[in-house]
Swiss-Prot record:
Organism: Saccharolobus solfataricus (strain ATCC 35092 / DSM 1617 / JCM 11322 / P2)
Family: Belongs to the class-I aminoacyl-tRNA synthetase family. MetG type 1 subfamily.
GO biological process: methionyl-tRNA aminoacylation
A GO term for molecular function: methionine-tRNA ligase activity
Positions in coiled-coil regions: none
NCBIfam families from the UniProt entry: metG
Gene that this sequence comes from: metG
The protein's name: Methionine--tRNA ligase
Enzyme class: ligase
Record's catalysed reaction(s): tRNA(Met) + L-methionine + ATP = L-methionyl-tRNA(Met) + AMP + diphosphate
């Protein structure tokens, strides 16, 4: 089994905020780390990259009178550093749409779709002041569906509807603010209508696709898919490969989706293997996972599979598109201009990155929009991490040290009570329950099952009271309790690893069990810490956030924000 894990490509015109992070990159990383333990590192590939073409970058470059690539070079390296070095995202390949391999692949792939591509004249807004056509974000106006007054020419950020510039009410040029005129210009259209029935059949027959993705895709095909322009009049983009389209570029969404393929090709080309990429894209023994925000569902559940079908090359279609709803910040939408939210270069200055990872997965908006609050953050860190997980690990291993000099005691399987059997049963069953939820893209739900297990373990330890067993000389019961407890700690470490890899490794070091990255997920279900094994030194695993953390956060964030702003690249300020 080959497992392809992808995260929606972050657009480089701004630093991602916490909502962006949980919507794609972090969720994908948690799943990729799980998948490597479950399927083996050699069978899992995790890719993404910087999405850097299109109108927002071109507009910014025009305003600053610089080449767009000057801006995206800086932004790509900044984001890449944050993901790989600060947040420790475990990409196998984090690339960019300016990659020569990507640009070459996109042009070659689109030429395979010519059977489904039509040329037609389209009316596009044109700014007579700036002497520019205004595709997509070059034009803004009022959304015809919800009345939002700052809708873009390609999509309304308020209601999520995909738009064309001609649909906007009272359109204005994004550069100078003047009202454009509409001019006819030739464009190339991908005829999605040819795939209406195929998309419906594919999405309806899937037993793994989440309901929110199915609903959006079926709504689209229910309304009838229509041809969509695949070219733009932008200069900043991949040149269109079609005959007569020399002055056109490829619409950013069509080319960015193909980055999932080109990133795999690039990864193996760097390793000197020109053919191995096909193992992740062709054949039945593949599972593919796409982690995205809900506003990207139409592109991944309709346009991407339609392009793959149109190539007539038997590309593997998406298995699970895990699309989150929106994460709010203290009840409001994230907003850079209004300074509402926390961005990923600010967050590590406020709290340990792995605390953030755990908190964000606990708040992951899987079924509905969820609300990030500092109060809930403090509760999660202080109660769930410190009190529930950290204290349990510390208590069990400290008692193994205290009562048995760090040697895991012998286990009498024929002398067990119902409470012992219950925890052993949970050790056997919980990893599968968590794994099954992860496989469905339900990371928050899987983490809740892990915490239920931790709470049961705490209740077991409190009920057994090993300190009393020791005092009363109940040696066999004490040994069984601490043997089971030590094995439950190992289970917790493996379940925690995808969310908090460094802290899971710390638990493994306390257990003296080597590198957890080399462990197998199934080991979490076993009693594999054997009697006679010598555990390591026991250390404090987590630290509580101080009582005044919440009350001081606003001032602290303001100071950090001023410092961070000074080091951000030009495009991201």
């Amino acid at each position: 089994m080959k497992v392809l894990v992808t995260a929606a490509w972050p657009y480089v015109n701004s630093v991602p905020h916490l909502g962006n992070l949980i919507g794609s990159i972090l969720s994908a990383d948690v799943f990729a780390r799980y998948a490597r333990l479950r399927y083996g590192k050699e069978n899992v590939l995790f890719v993404s990259g910087s999405d850097e073409h299109g109108t927002p970058i071109e507009i910014e470059a025009i305003k600053r009178k610089v080449n767009p690539k000057e801006l995206t070079d800086q932004a790509h390296e900044y984001d890449r550093h944050l993901f790989l070095n600060v947040w420790k995202i475990s990409f196998d390949n984090y690339t960019r749409t300016e990659s020569e391999i990507h640009k070459k692949f996109v042009r070659e792939f689109l030429l395979k779709l010519t059977k489904y591509i039509k040329v037609s004249e389209d009316e596009i807004p044109y700014c007579e002041n700036d002497k520019l056509y205004l595709p997509d974000r070059f034009v803004k106006g009022t959304c015809p569906y919800c009345g939002f007054e700052d809708a873009r020419g390609d999509q309304c950020d308020n209601c999520g509807k995909l738009l064309t510039p001609s649909l906007l009410v009272n359109p204005k040029c994004s550069i100078c603010g003047k009202t454009p005129v509409f001019k006819k210009t030739k464009h190339w259209f991908f005829d999605l209508s040819e795939f209406n029935d195929k998309i419906r059949g594919w999405i309806s027959s899937s037993n793994e696709m989440p309901d929110n993705v199915k609903s959006v895709a079926l709504s689209w095909v229910g309304e009838g898919l229509k041809p969509r322009s695949i070219t733009r009049d932008n200069k900043w983009g991949i040149p269109a490969p079609f005959e007569g389209a020399q002055d056109k570029s490829i619409y950013v969404w069509f080319e960015a989706l193909l980055g999932y393929i080109s990133a795999v090709i690039e990864y193996f080309e760097r390793k000197g293997d020109q053919e191995k990429w096909k193992e992740y894209w062709f054949g039945p023994n593949i599972k593919s996972y796409y982690f995205i925000g809900k506003d990207n569902i139409p592109f991944h559940a309709v346009i991407l599979p339609a392009m793959l079908m149109a190539s007539e090359e038997e590309y593997h279609l998406p298995d699970v598109i895990a699309a989150t709803e929106y994460l709010l910040y203290e009840g409001q939408k994230f907003s850079k201009s209004r300074k509402i939210g926390v961005w990923i270069d600010e967050a590590p200055e406020l709290m340990d990155v792995e605390y953030w990872r755990f908190v964000l997965i606990r708040l992951r908006p899987e079924e509905k929009d969820t609300n990030f609050t500092w109060r809930e953050t403090v509760r999660i860190v202080n109660t769930e991490l410190n009190d529930d997980i950290g204290n349990y690990v510390n208590r069990v291993l400290s008692m193994v040290n205290r009562y048995y000099s760090g040697i895991v005691p012998e286990f009498k399987i024929d002398i067990l009570d119902d409470n012992d059997r219950k925890i052993i049963s949970l050790i056997n069953e919980t990893p599968k329950v968590v794994g099954d939820l992860f496989e469905k893209g339900k990371l928050k739900a899987g983490t809740e099952e892990m915490l239920k297990f931790v709470r049961e373990c705490n209740a077991y330890l409190n009920m057994k009271a090993p300190w009393d067993l020791y005092k009363s000389g109940k040696e066999i019961e004490l040994k069984n309790t601490l043997y089971i407890g030590t094995n439950s700690v190992k289970t917790i470490a493996i379940l925690l690893y995808p969310l908090m890899p460094s802290h899971a490794q710390k638990i493994y070091e306390m257990l003296n069990m080597g590198n957890i990255e080399n462990e197998k997920w199934d080991v979490a279900s076993t009693l594999s810490v054997n009697p006679g094994h010598k555990i390591g030194k026991v250390n404090v695993l987590f630290k509580k956030l101080e009582p005044e953390f919440e009350s001081k956060i606003k001032d602290k964030l303001e100071k950090i924000r001023k410092d961070i702003e000074k080091i951000r690249p030009t495009l991201l300020k």
